[in-house]
Amino acid sequence: MKKISTFIITKNEEARIARAINSVKNITDEVIVVDNESTDDTVHIAKTLGAKVIVKPWLGYVGQKSFAESMCVNDWVLNIDADEELSQELQDEIEYIFASHNQDRYLAYQIKLLIMYRGDQKSRMFAPLNKCIRLYNKKFASFANTINSTTHDSVVFNKDVDFIGKIYLLNGIAYHYSGTSIEQLVNKANFYSSEQAKDLVKQGKKFSNFRLATEMIWWFLKAFFIRRYFVFGFDGFVDSIIFAFARFLRLAKLRELSLKSRNVIASDNYINYCMDIKSLLQKKKRSRYPKK
């Protein structure tokens, strides 16, 4: 009746993985956890809760999720992150859709993600809410369809699929819990910005000194006011700064990689130039002093 596989990617998530698995294990046939060589108790906890755990070295966000998706036996798959939890209302809604065999009326379902701040036991009024496809039929859509990025992990439909009117927004919500600590958020910002910078280089993006100078200001204002981090008070102020700093780091690292690439090219060109001069001088010497 269920015919759903859930997949989760993890890295040192011992503090949160149980909550995520417990929120999906009653509505899915299997829970696949693809772990990036955690050094804590993540793998043991996941196995104890009945998940199938596969240890896989890091392939990037898109690569890791694509691999996890491919490990699922069912066509219908549900993806959640280790820091997320389905509400009981959302669990009941998904269970009802599949129990009544109505899931194939649509190709994918969007889920509303409500941001919960560290330590919050209930949601705050006006808290940020994001919508994204997390439940879908992998015959028609996949994380693997994401191109030119290892970081922007999103479900993309196959090119030949007409998905207009085939995506349904579920009424229930899922909770997205923010970082476990400031240290964890800063570490994540550092790692994620490095991955993003590499993506930008692959895409041939150029850095701008003006954007570099204004990036933090713009993204702080966007996070604090437009994304409504102000709802979380001074803690939201701190998180907005970290978020903006991560965006700044992305461009700063792009600049660094671009300059390194230029220096390497310049160095190679100089070496080639010297070799050409040396070859030319040798030719002139041979022409001046021909063999007897």
From Swiss-Prot:
Keywords: Glycosyltransferase, Transferase. Its EC number is 2.4.-.-. It comes from the Bacteria. CDD domains: Beta4Glucosyltransferase. GO terms for molecular function: glycosyltransferase activity. Gene3D superfamilies: Spore Coat Polysaccharide Biosynthesis Protein SpsA, Chain A. Coiled coil: none annotated. PANTHER family: GLYCOSYLTRANSFERASE (PTHR43630:SF2), POLY-BETA-1,6-N-ACETYL-D-GLUCOSAMINE SYNTHASE (PTHR43630). Belongs to the glycosyltransferase 2 family. WaaE/KdtX subfamily. This is Uncharacterized glycosyltransferase RT0209. It comes from Rickettsia typhi (strain ATCC VR-144 / Wilmington). The lineage of its organism: Bacteria, Pseudomonadati, Pseudomonadota, Alphaproteobacteria, Rickettsiales.
